[in-house]
Amino acid sequence: MKKLILTAFLFASTMSTNTLADIKMGIILGFTGPIESLTPAMAASAELAFNEASDSGKLLGGQKISVERADSTCVDSAAATTAAEGLVSNGVVAIMGADCSGVTGAIATNVAVPNGVVMISPSATSPGLTDLNDNGYFFRTAPSDARGGQILADITKDRKVKNVAITYTNNDYGKGLADVYE
């Protein structure tokens, strides 16, 4: 009986399982920092889409997506770059994020593009990202502030507003929008 069990075990352990490896996706958002109240819903939305694709059974012959989260902080480019390097070293093939324009540019320039990792931001709007030397690896779903600022300026002109005071948050987002509006 022992020989039968041992033979069965050896036979089973040498069989090919034909299992497909997971597709590793990274989500990097400012889970801490000035927009931390927004990022849980952003991450959950991405994970919902990834789960739907996985559960369909039609993704690349039935492969599944596994997700790893990282914190961009939204404001600390060095911390965001380190977090993105961790995602890449763990084998992610694409990154959803980052959220804020400054850290998004830092991650794209220093991590994603040099490592050939596709990156798509749901919210980075800095006009500077438009001309990023990304070799086709960076995308965003939100329009550039160059467009938003121009529309706001056009509305102001159409309404014949004579005087405007501009205040803005002193970061890439605020400065980019203010510069375009002026």
What are these regions (language model features)?
Residues 21-26, 118-122:
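Short coil-to-beta-strand
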Residues 89-182:
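Extracytoplasmic ligand/sensor domains, especially the bilobed periplasmic-binding protein
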